[in-house]
Amino acid sequence: MSKRRVVVTGLGMLSPVGNTVESTWKALLAGQSGISLIDHFDTSAYATKFAGLVKDFNCDDIISRKEQRKMDAFIQYGIVAGVQAMQDSGLEVTEENASRIGAAIGSGIGGLGLIEENHSSLVKGGPRKISPFFVPSTIVNMVAGHLTIMYGLRGPSISIATACTSGVHNIGNAARIIAYGDADAMVAGGAEKASTPLGVGGFGAARALSTRNDNPQAASRPWDKERDGFVLGDGAGMLVLEEYEHAKARGAKIYAEIVGFGMSSDAYHMTSPPENGAGAALAMVNALRDAAIEPAQIGYVNAHGTSTPAGDKAETQAVKSVFGDAARRVMVSSTKSMTGHLLGAAGAVESIFSILALRDQAIPPTINLDNPDEGCDLDFVPHEARQVSDLEYALCNSFGFGGTNGSLIFKKI
């Protein structure tokens, strides 16, 4: 069967550098870091004392105070970004089309903050002190659940939780749901709020986080010799995907087309990639095959680029193996240098950055890349954004614990 074309018609975002898509994008092109000291719990006993936090967040105009008390912050972030995306798309939900519109929204961890709070209540006061809303306030699929209820969406509702690849996997699979005719539109993306005592402590115990407490804004430095781990980030990214003819018929604004989606597994280690980046390479190869294009046609790669010693080198090797001679020409940058790592929301916000790069013909920089590490010798767009003129395809990479990999390819339209 022939696949239907899938386009992006709406965008929504909360990030450490902005509470809307456009404010975030403006900050990224200016090379602004959103990393700051953690101020919502005492970090004196923690090795890492900073993260990429969502700032000045208020959702009272979208979610009542009563309902907010029944939701972890990641759910609130996801709902707000989802509402932004739906409003941006102009998609009207009616009784006639509601069964053809769905949601695919994930999270890497889910409601960690309220899990911690309810466990504390259990320990201090016994099971009677656990909130009756504990389960629906924390489980991963509740962003999709709330948005489908708010908008009356009766199409597919799924939530893929694949660690840091969750965002890309939800977007890619939402696109396939549309491509194969099971829906005409989907809200897709990811949401995360892991800057909690257990989140910061857990990743810190694994020695995965940077400990550059004297200069947090310089801590996320992908491919730099002095990198010492990733920086946690909070936020959400949501996209409205539509079948091309459906979008065109209603006169929708079209940002880009999703032309390729690839997945793979490392089958190597729980938390580390193989040095040759074979799993990451396979995801990119599968996405390129799905898009039916050659590697040299990709002008920009929004890299996973987490600022970890092993991960950055492995992704560099993966790009070299997939792109061959074209690897020296493709622009590769890590927006995590500014936002930190949004875990299950990373692939969603970075898909949006890839789409905006196509729209504005502008490549966001990799900040803090002062001294590239040995073997990290691609065009990483250091320090400053770059204006281009002929960018047609952008590729977005996400890789996660457990060796799960995903790549999306977007085309300017």
Where are these regions (language model features)?
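Glycine-/small-residue-rich "gating" segment that lines the acyl/pantetheine channel
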Residues: 124-131, 172, 176, 180, ...
